[in-house]
Swiss-Prot record:
Cellular component aspect of the GO annotation: mitochondrial inner membrane; mitochondrion
Entry-linked Pfam families: Mito_carr
Membrane topology: Multi-pass membrane protein
Annotated family: Belongs to the mitochondrial carrier (TC 2.A.29) family.
Species, as recorded: Arabidopsis thaliana
Protein name: Mitochondrial thiamine diphosphate carrier 1
PANTHER family, sorted: SOLUTE CARRIER FAMILY 25 (PTHR24089)
Residue ranges of the TM segments: 13-29, 88-105, 127-150, 182-199, 231-247, 304-323
InterPro entries for this protein: Mit_carrier, Mitochondrial_sb/sol_carrier, Mt_carrier_dom_sf
C-alpha cells in the first residue's frame, strides 16, 4: 500500500466527516435564511398575484403582495416567530438532506478521481462536478422528502393556523391523501433537483477553480498552499457559494413553484389567505406549468423569485463555507 493511501482517512471515517459537516452546514444555513424561505413559500402557494404591478388587471385581492409589505404583514400578524414557521420539520429535513448530499457527493467524486483527497477532486472535469451534484441531490431529496413537504405545509399558513403543529399536519395529510401523500410532488422535485443541484455544485467547483487560478497568478507564491482548497480564503468561498446559489435558483425557480403547488394541493387553507390548490388540480408537472402559465402568466411561474434569489445567494454561501470549515474541523479532530 502506498504512503498516499495510508495518509487518506478510512472510508467510513470520511463518510462520517462529510455527513456531519453537511448536517452542520445545512442547519446553520436553514436558521439564517428561514425568514426569506417563509415569504417565498407564501408567494408560491398563493394563486392570486403577488406583485403590485400584476394587480392592475386583476379582480382578485391577494393576501400577500410585495416583499416589504409581506414582511410587515407577517411580523404584525404573527410576530418574529412567524418568520421561522415550519422550522422544526425544515431542520429535520435539511440536516439529513445535506448530510446525505455531501456524503454522496464526496463518494461519487472519490470514485471518479480514484482518491478521497480534496486536492485530487479539484482536478476533476467540470462535467463530473455537475453530474456528482445532481446524483447527490437526488439521493438527498428521496431520503428527506416527507419533512420537506411538512415544512412547506406549515410555512405556508399564517394566523389563524389550520395545522397547529407538525403532528396535526402529518395526520391530516395521511388521512386526506394516504401515505403516498407524504411524497406528493416528488417527481417534479427530482426533475427540479437534477439541474438545480448539478448547477449549484458544478458552478461552485467552477468558481473555486477560477479563484484558485486567480490566487496563483496574482498572489505571492509564499502565501499559497499545497492544498488547493486551503488556498482560498473564507471570503472567496463565500463568494463562490453566493454565485452558485444565485445561478442555480434563477434557472430552476419555475419547477420549485410547481413542486410547492403539488405539496399543498387538496389541503385545508384558511379563506383569509385566498383560494387553495384543489386536489388533483394538476395532472403532472408539465400540466402544472401549463396551467400556471395560462391562468397566472409568466409572473406565476416566478412567484417568490425575489425572496428566493435573495435567500439562495446567502444560503449557498453559508452552506458551502460552513461545510468547508466544519469538514476541516472534523478532519483535524477525527483523523
Amino acid at each position: 500500500m502506498s504512503g498516499t493511501e495510508l495518509d487518506e482517512p478510512g472510508k467510513l471515517k470520511r463518510a462520517v466527516i462529510d455527513a456531519s459537516a453537511g448536517g452542520v452546514a445545512g442547519a446553520i444555513s436553514r436558521m439564517v435564511t428561514s425568514p426569506l424561505d417563509v415569504i417565498k413559500i407564501r408567494f408560491q402557494v398563493q394563486l392570486e398575484p403577488t406583485a403590485t404591478w400584476a394587480l392592475k388587471d386583476s379582480q382578485l385581492k391577494p393576501k400577500y403582495n410585495g416583499l416589504f409589505r409581506t414582511t410587515k404583514d407577517i411580523f404584525r400578524e404573527e410576530g418574529l416567530s412567524g418568520f421561522w414557521r415550519g422550522n422544526v420539520p425544515a431542520l429535520l429535513m435539511v440536516v439529513p438532506y445535506t448530510s446525505i448530499q455531501f456524503a454522496v457527493l464526496h463518494k461519487v467524486k472519490s470514485f471518479a478521481a480514484g482518491s478521497s483527497k480534496a486536492e485530487n477532486h479539484a482536478q476533476l472535469s467540470p462535467y463530473l462536478s455537475y453530474i456528482s451534484g445532481a446524483l447527490a441531490g437526488c439521493a438527498a431529496t428521496v431520503g428527506s422528502y416527507p419533512f420537506d413537504l411538512l415544512r412547506t405545509v406549515l410555512a405556508s399558513q399564517g394566523e389563524p393556523k389550520v395545522y397547529p403543529n407538525m403532528r396535526s399536519a402529518f395526520l391530516s395529510i395521511v388521512q386526506t391523501r394516504g401515505i403516498k401523500g407524504l411524497y406528493a410532488g416528488l417527481s417534479p422535485t427530482l426533475i427540479e433537483i437534477i439541474p438545480y443541484a448539478g448547477l449549484q455544485f458544478g458552478t461552485y467547483d467552477t468558481f473555486k477553480r477560477w479563484s484558485m487560478v486567480y490566487n496563483k497568478r496574482y498572489r505571492s507564491s509564499s502565501s499559497s498552499s499545497t492544498n488547493p482548497s486551503d488556498s482560498l480564503s473564507s471570503f472567496q468561498l463565500f463568494l463562490c457559494g453566493l454565485a452558485s446559489g444565485t445561478v442555480s435558483k434563477l434557472v430552476c425557480h419555475p419547477l420549485d413553484v410547481v413542486k410547492k403547488r403539488f405539496q399543498v394541493e387538496g389541503l385545508q387553507r384558511h379563506p383569509k389567505y385566498g383560494a387553495r390548490v384543489e386536489l388533483n388540480a394538476y395532472k403532472n408537472m408539465f400540466d402544472g406549468l401549463g396551467q400556471i402559465l395560462r391562468s397566472e402568466g409568466w409572473h406565476g411561474l416566478y412567484k417568490g423569485i425575489v425572496p428566493s434569489t435573495i435567500k439562495a445567494a446567502p444560503a449557498g454561501a453559508v452552506t458551502f463555507v460552513a461545510y468547508e470549515l466544519a469538514s476541516d474541523w472534523f478532519e483535524a479532530n477525527l483523523t
